[in-house]
Design a protein with these regions (language model features):
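Extreme N-terminal starter segment of soluble prokaryotic enzymes
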Residues: 1-4
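Short, well-ordered beta-to-alpha junction loops that form the rim of enzyme active sites
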Residues: 8, 94-97, 137
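Short N-terminal binding/cap micro-motifs at the start of the first secondary-structure element
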Residues: 11-18
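Short, surface-exposed acidic-centric catalytic microdomains
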Residues: 21-62
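Short amphipathic alpha-helices and their capping/turn segments at secondary-structure boundaries
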Residues: 22-35, 75-90
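Divalent-metal-activated hydrolytic enzyme cores
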Residues: 43, 52-55, 59-78, 82, ...
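Short, active-site-adjacent cap segments at secondary-structure transitions
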Residues: 45-46, 98-101, 140
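N-terminal glycine-rich phosphate/adenylate-binding segment common to multiple enzyme folds
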Residues: 78-109
Length: 150
C-alpha cells in the first residue's frame, strides 16, 4: 500500500521550530509499505524554522499576525498533487497542525487551546476521498486491530 506521511513524523527536521515529530509507531506501521513523505508547509515555500501558525477565522496566520494562508494552501495543493501522482491510499498526518491536523487544531489564539477541526492539507485529502489518520491515534488503532475489535 502507498502511504503518505507527514515528513516530520519520519524524523525530517521540517517542523516550525526546526525540529521534528519523530514517531516510532508511524515508522513501524509504515514498514513494508511504500512511504511518500511530504511537508506541505515547506512545499508552500515556508522556511524551517518559521514562526508558529494557527488557523484564525478560516485564515492561516502566524503568531506575529502575518497572513500565511496562501503559502499553506499552495503547499497543501502541491502535497495533494504528489499524493495523487503516487496513488496514495492512506495518509498519516501530524496531530493539531494547521496543515495536517485531522480531528483537532489549535483555536487561533496561540494559547494551546484545541478545537475540533482539520488543517488545510488534511481537509483537502479528505475532500478527495483519501483515508486520513491522526498520528496520535495510530497506537490505539494498532491495538484495536491486534485485539480483533476494529
Amino acid at each position: 500500500m502507498k502511504i503518505l506521511v507527514s515528513a516530520c513524523l519520519l524524523g525530517e527536521n521540517c517542523k516550525y521550530s526546526g525540529g521534528n515529530n519523530y514517531n516510532q509507531a508511524v515508522c513501524d506501521f509504515a514498514r513494508g509499505h511504500q512511504v511518500v513523505p511530504v511537508c506541505p508547509e515547506v512545499l508552500g515555500g515556508l522556511p524551517t524554522p518559521r514562526c508558529p501558525a494557527e488557523i484564525v477565522q478560516g485564515v492561516v496566520t502566524n503568531k506575529e499576525g502575518i497572513n500565511v494562508d496562501q503559502e499553506f494552501r499552495a503547499g497543501a495543493a502541491k502535497a495533494l498533487a504528489i499524493a495523487k501522482e503516487n496513488g496514495v491510499e492512506l495518509a498519516i498526518l501530524q496531530s493539531r497542525s494547521p496543515s495536517c491536523g485531522v480531528k483537532e487544531i489549535y483555536d487561533g489564539t496561540f494559547s494551546g487551546t484545541k478545537i475540533p477541526g482539520q488543517g488545510v492539507f488534511a481537509k483537502m485529502l479528505m475532500d478527495e476521498g483519501v483515508r486520513v489518520l491522526d498520528a496520535g491515534e495510530l497506537p490505539k488503532i494498532i491495538l484495536k486491530n491486534e485485539d480483533g475489535k476494529c
